């Protein structure tokens, strides 16, 4: 009997991996029936991540937007899912426990079936309470492992993490390969090990296309026993976003898997509608570079989901750095040259900062530190002289335990800098206490 693979259309992340904003409520109401008509999706990502935040930024009520988008899928039995930042809920900073507990009741009432709970530190303490609250609210708790590639993040590391999350009550496991740098063979090893011990646990794979591994990774995890794959569709597929459902469906069908057919007439209609939303106003926030893959991402590991904000930040800093270089009579940098320098600096400082998974909010913290280091360099200042409070909160354990070790110079800098007020966060200081 053929193994069935289901598809989830990550319509929310398609947009936020391309730019900043998501469609308005009226636009979501238009696209939902067409997504249903495509006939190939068992799940749709409707909200979470930064969706609710950006709704507020352009004056729309996110509660109404979520209800509007989930309703058509609820009526036909397509499961809806949201992205949930664990300790941070839908924010960039820690949220009180009672508010997080209430969030699951609210989101379930708004029509969301599954919550994908993740922590950029992969700290089970940030995920397991949310598993219990989500289940109590009637949602399916999908515990997430943020995938990256480092000396710390081995197959054994992830297999052990999955075991802790399943023991903590997780009903499903998501491999969130947010930068697409998980190596296909390693991902297959992880999925196979989980399935051998827990055959009834649903495994969903989420991969970004940026560095080019994602298609191979999807085939590998499917062969290892994964149940659901996250996919995108044109005009917001490929590039630094996600693989397109057409390609993945054809690949898996040829490989002997049971996959649903795609109604191509509906696909083209959804494609046209999505393009019209871009033409309306959303396209102004999509950098053309996000439609281009880059092997430079293999080394730095920055996630596809932050490429929109990264390019906006880079443009803002580009002029300031060049102004400093010009004052010193040094050669100015092109935007591409600065981008390569940024990737190199991220790769250099990431292990120094404890090797957090480069996913929201820690990808922003590490990227910001790297960008400010480049600015400091243009000012002839020492590195890490412009670290923001959020970075110190991560270093001092405010959001949980860092996966790796802090570099000695970061520990010394922490001791020399008056940031003791960050010692009392969700957990106080990390076990690698950096202050006397």
Language-model segments: which ranges?
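C-terminal helical cap(s) of enzyme catalytic domains, especially alpha/beta-barrels
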Residues: 237-262, 269
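Catalytic cores of alpha/beta
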Residues: 153-165, 211-227
């Amino acid at each position: 009997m053929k193994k069935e693979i289901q598809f989830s259309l990550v319509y929310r992340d398609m947009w936020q991996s391309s730019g900043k904003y998501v469609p308005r409520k009226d636009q979501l109401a238009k696209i939902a029936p067409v997504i249903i008509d495509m006939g190939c999706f068992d799940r749709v990502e409707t909200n979470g991540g930064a969706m609710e935040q950006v709704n507020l930024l352009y004056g729309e009520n996110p509660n109404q937007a979520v209800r509007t988008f989930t309703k058509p899928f609820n009526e036909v039995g397509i499961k809806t899912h949201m992205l949930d930042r664990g300790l941070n809920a839908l924010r960039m900073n820690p949220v009180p426990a009672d508010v997080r507990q209430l969030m699951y009741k609210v989101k379930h009432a708004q029509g969301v079936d599954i919550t994908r709970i993740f922590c950029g530190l992969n700290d089970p303490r940030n995920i397991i309470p949310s598993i219990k609250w989500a289940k109590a609210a009637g949602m399916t708790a999908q515990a997430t492992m943020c995938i990256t590639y480092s000396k710390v993040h081995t197959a054994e590391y992830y297999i052990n993490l999955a075991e802790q999350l399943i023991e903590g009550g997780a009903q499903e496991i998501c491999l969130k390969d947010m930068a697409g740098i998980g190596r296909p063979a390693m991902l297959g090893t992880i999925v196979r090990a989980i399935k051998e011990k827990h055959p009834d646990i649903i495994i969903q794979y989420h991969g970004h296309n940026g560095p080019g591994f994602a298609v191979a990774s999807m085939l590998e995890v499917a062969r290892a026993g994964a149940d659901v794959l996250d996919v995108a569709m044109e005009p917001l597929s490929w590039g630094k976003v996600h693989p397109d459902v057409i390609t993945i469906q054809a690949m898996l069908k040829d490989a002997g898997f049971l996959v649903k057919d795609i109604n191509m007439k509906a696909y083209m209609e959804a494609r046209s509608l999505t393009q019209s939303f871009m033409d309306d106003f959303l396209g102004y926030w999509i950098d053309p570079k996000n439609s281009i893959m880059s092997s430079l991402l293999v080394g730095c590991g920055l996630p596809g989901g932050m490429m929109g904000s990264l390019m906006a930040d880079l443009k803002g800093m580009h002029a300031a750095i060049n102004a400093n270089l010009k004052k010193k009579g040094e050669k100015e940098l092109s935007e591409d040259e600065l981008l390569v320098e940024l990737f190199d600096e991220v790769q250099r400082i990431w292990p120094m900062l404890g090797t957090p998974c480069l996913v929201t909010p820690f990808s922003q913290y590490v990227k910001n530190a790297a960008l400010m280091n480049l600015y400091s360099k243009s000012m002839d200042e020492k590195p890490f002289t412009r670290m923001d409070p959020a970075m110190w909160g991560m270093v001092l354990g405010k959001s949980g335990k860092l996966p790796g070790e802090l570099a000695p110079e970061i520990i010394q800098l922490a001791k020399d800098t008056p940031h003791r007020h960050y010692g009392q966060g969700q957990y106080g200081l990390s076990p690698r206490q950096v202050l006397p």
